[in-house]
Design a protein with these regions (language model features):
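Conserved, mostly hydrophobic/aromatic
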Residues: 22, 41, 49-52, 119, ...
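Catalytic cores of alpha/beta
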Residues: 31-42, 159-168, 211, 215-231
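Glycine-rich phosphate-binding active-site loops on the catalytic face of alpha/beta enzymes
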Residues: 46-56, 124-128, 133, 177-185, ...
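Active-site-adjacent beta->alpha loops and helix N-cap segments on the catalytic face
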Residues: 2-12, 31, 56-67, 77-89, ...
Length: 265
């Protein structure tokens, strides 16, 4: 079973810095570009990579990521084809963890056991399922455990103490703290209150804590990385890819490299 997530965070602890986790939508704008982006991101500064699974009803996604999902679906994205891109990536990149992020419906239609088996075989390390609360994970959890896939939990600022405890106990790999309320990319994260929230969350979990939603600039990455274990940048990167369609890989690599400069503690 893969230990890439644990090994990556342990390495970064020794280097005294947080991880940079860029998010891209699988198949946005097409398979060839996604494969090239995945290939380029580690050298640009990505420590882990999140790949979005496009879905036709993405309730937590803002307009930037919704549009990316629609482009991906129009390009022929399926869960099976995205796993193929991960397999292709893993043939060249043995150590960079890959996290899939999406909604439960595509996984359910694929088949819970089949998904976990195929994802682990392709080289996926963890999964974030936006709409699967701990109370409903029962049918999926045995297959996740058997395959070694980590179930990364989202924790919101609105989560009460008991909810945070339940989510933390259900999580593996790391936990993902949502820095703002609302949909992805809707507004900028308010870093002045984030540190207090993260310090409080550490009382409930020993897992690394990633912070995402609303982080758009290198300055924000620098600020948030000082008190978190990882920083996720999604909508801002997806927007760069959309605005630089013909040079998406070059533009995305430059943007990620700029973000990575702020990660030294």
């Amino acid at each position: 079973m893969s230990q890439r997530i644990e090994n990556t965070f342990e390495k970064l602890r020794r280097e005294n810095r947080a991880a940079l986790i860029p998010f891209i939508m699988g198949y946005d704008p097409d398979a060839t570009t996604t494969a090239a982006l995945l290939d380029a991101l580690p050298a640009a500064g990505a420590d882990l990579i999140e790949i979005g699974i496009p879905f036709s009803e993405p309730m937590a996604d803002g307009p930037v990521i919704q549009a990316a999902g629609l482009r991906a679906l129009a390009a022929g994205a399926t869960l099976h084809s995205i796993l193929g891109l991960v397999r292709q990536f893993r043939a060249k990149h043995a150590d960079t963890p890959i996290i899939l992020m999406g909604y439960f419906n595509p996984l359910y239609r694929y088949g819970n056991e089949r998904f976990c088996t195929d994802a682990a075989a392709a080289g996926v390390d963890g999964i974030i399922i936006v709409d699967l609360p701990p109370e409903e994970e029962g049918e999926l959890k045995p297959y996740l455990d058997a395959s070694g896939l980590k179930l990364i939990r989202l924790i919101a600022p609105t989560s009460g103490a008991e909810r945070v405890k339940l989510l933390s106990q259900s999580a593996s790999g790391f936990v993902y703290y949502i820095s703002i309320t609302g949909i992805t990319g809707a507004k900028a994260a308010q870093t002045d209150t984030l540190k207090t929230q993260i310090d409080h969350l550490r009382q409930s979990t020993d897992l690394p804590i990633a912070v995402g939603f609303g982080i758009k600039t290198a300055e924000q990455v620098k600020t948030v990385s000082a008190f978190s274990d990882a920083v996720v940048v999604g909508s801002a990167l997806v927007d760069v890819i959309a605005r630089n369609k013909n040079e998406a890989v070059k533009a995305a690599s430059a943007f990620v490299s700029e973000l990575a400069k702020g990660l030294k503690r």
